[in-house]
Amino acid sequence: MRSEWRLSTINEICSLVTDGAHNSPKSVINGAYMASVKDFTEYGLDFSSCRMISEEDYEKLRLQGCVPEFNDILVGKDGARYFEDIIIYKQPEKPALLSSIAILRTDRKKVIPEFLYYTLKSPSVRKDVRDNYGSGSAIPRIVLKDFKRMPVAFPPIDEQKKLVSIFVSIDEQIQNNNKINNNLAA
C-alpha cells in the first residue's frame, strides 16, 4: 500500500450503513417493489420476480431508510451467497429493501462509490469478510456492526477516479465478451 493511501473503516467512509426492513409487509398484486437478496443479478436488481407491497407500507419503509438512492452500494448480507452479491444501484426503480440487503452510502469527500464497490468485489476482501466477519451457522450472514468495523484502504479521490476508470474499462470488456459468448451459444 502506498504511503498516500489511508486506512479507515466502512463506518468512517460512509455517511450511511444500514439495511432493509426487518419486517415483511403483506404482498399485494399492484403496488411498490420490495426487493430481497433473491432479486440480485450481477449488475442490478431483477424486478420481474420482486414482491409488491402497498404504497402505504412502502412509504413507511421509505421513511425508515429502506429505499436505496442512486449510487448506493447494495450488498447481499444473508444466506449462502452473503457478500457475493454486490452492486452499485443505478436503476430508476425505487424499491424498498428487506434486511437481507445492506445499503452503503459513501461520503464522497473520502471515497467515491465505484471505488468502494470494486474494493468490496475484490477476492481478497471477500475472503477476509468470510473468514473474519461472517456469523451464523444455519444462515450465514454479516451483521451491520461488523460491516461498520471492516477496514478499507483508499487513495486520494483523484487516484480513486483513475483506478475506477481502469476497472470500468475491464468490466465493460467482460460484459461485451459475455454477450458475445451468449450469442454464440444461442
Which sequence ranges carry the predicted segments?
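Flexible, active-site-proximal loop/turn residues at the rims of small-molecule/cofactor binding pockets
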Residues: T41, A80, P156
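A generic structural signal for short beta-strands and their flanking turns/coil linkers
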Residues: G31, S49, L98-S100
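Sequence-specific dsDNA recognition surfaces
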Residues: L7-K26, K38-I73
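Non-catalytic DNA-recognition/assembly elements of restriction-modification systems
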Residues: M1-G20, R149-A186
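A short glycine-rich beta-alpha junction/loop motif
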Residues: K94-I101, E114, G134-V164
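A short beta-sheet element
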Residues: S36-V37, E55-S122
